[in-house]
Amino acid sequence: LHSTSRRQRQMCIRDRDLLILVEEMRKVATNLYVTTDDGTYGFHGMGTNQLQELWDKGVRYDHCVAIGPMIMMKFVCKLTKELGIPTVVSMNPIMVDGTGMCGACRLMVGGEVKFACVDGPEFDGHQVDFDQAMKRQLQYKTEEGRAMLKLQEGDTHHGGCGQCGGEA
Protein backbone atom coordinates (compact mmCIF):
# COMPACT_ATOMS: atom_id res chain seq x y z
CA LEU A 1 0.00 0.00 0.00
CA HIS A 2 2.68 2.48 0.98
CA SER A 3 4.77 2.00 -2.16
CA THR A 4 1.89 2.90 -4.48
CA SER A 5 1.18 6.19 -2.71
CA ARG A 6 -0.42 7.51 0.42
CA ARG A 7 -4.15 7.53 0.04
CA GLN A 8 -7.46 7.84 1.80
CA ARG A 9 -8.46 4.69 3.68
CA GLN A 10 -11.68 3.78 5.41
CA MET A 11 -12.14 0.90 7.85
CA CYS A 12 -15.65 -0.13 8.88
CA ILE A 13 -16.25 -2.58 11.69
CA ARG A 14 -19.01 -3.62 14.08
CA ASP A 15 -17.27 -2.47 17.28
CA ARG A 16 -13.91 -1.38 18.70
CA ASP A 17 -13.05 -4.90 19.94
CA LEU A 18 -12.87 -6.17 16.35
CA LEU A 19 -10.49 -3.49 15.05
CA ILE A 20 -7.10 -4.71 13.85
CA LEU A 21 -4.10 -3.10 12.15
CA VAL A 22 -5.23 0.47 12.83
CA GLU A 23 -1.71 1.78 13.50
CA GLU A 24 -0.32 -0.10 10.49
CA MET A 25 -3.00 1.46 8.29
CA ARG A 26 -2.22 4.93 9.65
CA LYS A 27 1.38 4.49 8.45
CA VAL A 28 0.28 3.95 4.84
CA ALA A 29 -2.69 6.28 4.67
CA THR A 30 -2.78 10.03 4.29
CA ASN A 31 -6.12 9.93 6.07
CA LEU A 32 -7.65 6.97 7.87
CA TYR A 33 -11.37 7.08 8.56
CA VAL A 34 -12.66 4.47 11.01
CA THR A 35 -16.35 3.67 11.34
CA THR A 36 -17.92 1.47 14.00
CA ASP A 37 -21.56 0.44 13.88
CA ASP A 38 -21.93 1.06 17.61
CA GLY A 39 -19.83 4.24 17.84
CA THR A 40 -17.18 2.80 20.17
CA TYR A 41 -14.42 4.13 17.89
CA GLY A 42 -14.40 6.77 15.19
CA PHE A 43 -17.50 7.62 13.16
CA HIS A 44 -20.73 6.18 14.58
CA GLY A 45 -22.84 4.50 11.94
CA MET A 46 -22.70 2.40 8.84
CA GLY A 47 -19.64 2.58 6.62
CA THR A 48 -21.80 3.58 3.67
CA ASN A 49 -23.04 6.61 5.61
CA GLN A 50 -19.50 7.79 6.27
CA LEU A 51 -18.44 7.07 2.68
CA GLN A 52 -21.33 9.17 1.36
CA GLU A 53 -20.56 11.96 3.84
CA LEU A 54 -16.86 11.99 2.88
CA TRP A 55 -17.76 11.94 -0.83
CA ASP A 56 -20.09 14.90 -0.31
CA LYS A 57 -17.17 16.78 1.33
CA GLY A 58 -14.94 16.17 -1.69
CA VAL A 59 -12.96 13.09 -0.57
CA ARG A 60 -12.42 10.86 -3.60
CA TYR A 61 -11.52 7.20 -3.93
CA ASP A 62 -10.15 5.50 -7.04
CA HIS A 63 -11.19 2.03 -5.86
CA CYS A 64 -12.85 0.20 -3.00
CA VAL A 65 -12.22 -3.21 -1.44
CA ALA A 66 -15.15 -4.53 0.60
CA ILE A 67 -14.74 -7.54 2.86
CA GLY A 68 -17.37 -8.60 5.37
CA PRO A 69 -20.96 -9.76 5.62
CA MET A 70 -22.74 -10.09 2.27
CA ILE A 71 -25.44 -7.60 3.22
CA MET A 72 -22.78 -4.98 3.97
CA MET A 73 -20.93 -5.67 0.72
CA LYS A 74 -24.21 -5.42 -1.21
CA PHE A 75 -24.90 -1.91 0.07
CA VAL A 76 -21.28 -0.78 -0.30
CA CYS A 77 -21.43 -1.91 -3.94
CA LYS A 78 -24.75 -0.19 -4.50
CA LEU A 79 -23.26 3.11 -3.28
CA THR A 80 -19.90 2.76 -5.04
CA LYS A 81 -21.66 1.95 -8.30
CA GLU A 82 -23.66 5.18 -7.99
CA LEU A 83 -20.43 7.07 -7.24
CA GLY A 84 -18.49 5.39 -10.06
CA ILE A 85 -15.91 3.75 -7.77
CA PRO A 86 -14.64 0.35 -8.99
CA THR A 87 -15.18 -2.16 -6.18
CA VAL A 88 -13.72 -5.56 -5.42
CA VAL A 89 -15.48 -7.83 -2.93
CA SER A 90 -14.18 -10.91 -1.17
CA MET A 91 -16.99 -13.44 -1.21
CA ASN A 92 -17.17 -15.93 1.63
CA PRO A 93 -19.96 -18.42 0.93
CA ILE A 94 -19.79 -21.88 2.45
CA MET A 95 -17.18 -23.96 0.62
CA VAL A 96 -17.27 -27.73 0.96
CA ASP A 97 -14.65 -29.31 -1.30
CA GLY A 98 -12.61 -26.36 -2.55
CA THR A 99 -12.63 -27.62 -6.15
CA GLY A 100 -15.98 -26.32 -7.43
CA MET A 101 -17.38 -29.85 -7.81
CA CYS A 102 -19.90 -29.60 -4.96
CA GLY A 103 -21.31 -26.25 -6.10
CA ALA A 104 -21.85 -25.00 -2.55
CA CYS A 105 -20.03 -21.73 -3.24
CA ARG A 106 -21.75 -21.05 -6.58
CA LEU A 107 -22.39 -17.38 -7.35
CA MET A 108 -23.76 -15.40 -10.25
CA VAL A 109 -21.24 -12.78 -11.35
CA GLY A 110 -21.97 -10.70 -14.43
CA GLY A 111 -24.69 -13.16 -15.41
CA GLU A 112 -22.29 -16.12 -15.35
CA VAL A 113 -21.92 -18.93 -12.84
CA LYS A 114 -18.72 -18.62 -10.81
CA PHE A 115 -17.39 -20.64 -7.89
CA ALA A 116 -15.82 -18.68 -5.05
CA CYS A 117 -13.42 -21.52 -4.26
CA VAL A 118 -11.82 -21.67 -7.73
CA ASP A 119 -12.78 -18.43 -9.51
CA GLY A 120 -12.44 -16.14 -6.51
CA PRO A 121 -12.93 -15.30 -3.77
CA GLU A 122 -12.40 -11.77 -5.14
CA PHE A 123 -14.88 -10.48 -7.72
CA ASP A 124 -16.04 -7.21 -9.26
CA GLY A 125 -18.62 -6.23 -6.67
CA HIS A 126 -20.79 -4.42 -9.18
CA GLN A 127 -21.26 -7.72 -11.05
CA VAL A 128 -22.18 -9.96 -8.09
CA ASP A 129 -25.82 -10.98 -7.64
CA PHE A 130 -25.90 -10.49 -3.87
CA ASP A 131 -29.60 -11.32 -3.52
CA GLN A 132 -29.07 -14.76 -5.02
CA ALA A 133 -25.88 -15.32 -2.99
CA MET A 134 -27.67 -14.45 0.26
CA LYS A 135 -30.56 -16.79 -0.59
CA ARG A 136 -28.09 -19.60 -1.24
CA GLN A 137 -26.47 -18.96 2.16
CA LEU A 138 -29.79 -19.66 3.86
CA GLN A 139 -29.90 -23.25 2.62
CA TYR A 140 -27.28 -24.20 5.22
CA LYS A 141 -28.79 -22.38 8.20
CA THR A 142 -30.50 -25.50 9.61
CA GLU A 143 -27.28 -27.52 9.55
CA GLU A 144 -25.31 -24.61 11.01
CA GLY A 145 -27.87 -24.34 13.82
CA ARG A 146 -27.67 -28.05 14.59
CA ALA A 147 -23.88 -27.94 14.62
CA MET A 148 -23.96 -24.96 16.99
CA LEU A 149 -26.37 -26.78 19.33
CA LYS A 150 -24.11 -29.82 19.31
CA LEU A 151 -21.13 -27.64 20.15
CA GLN A 152 -23.01 -25.89 22.97
CA GLU A 153 -24.71 -28.97 24.42
CA GLY A 154 -21.99 -31.55 23.88
CA ASP A 155 -23.01 -35.11 24.71
CA THR A 156 -26.55 -34.09 25.65
CA HIS A 157 -27.33 -33.07 22.05
CA HIS A 158 -29.33 -35.73 20.17
CA GLY A 159 -30.86 -34.28 17.05
CA GLY A 160 -31.70 -30.63 17.17
CA CYS A 161 -34.46 -29.91 19.67
CA GLY A 162 -31.90 -28.68 22.18
CA GLN A 163 -34.08 -29.65 25.12
CA CYS A 164 -34.54 -33.40 25.47
CA GLY A 165 -31.06 -34.59 26.43
CA GLY A 166 -32.23 -38.11 25.61
CA GLU A 167 -31.71 -40.51 22.76
CA ALA A 168 -32.72 -39.46 19.26
What are these regions (language model features)?
Residues 16-168:
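Reductase modules of NAD(P)H-dependent flavoproteins
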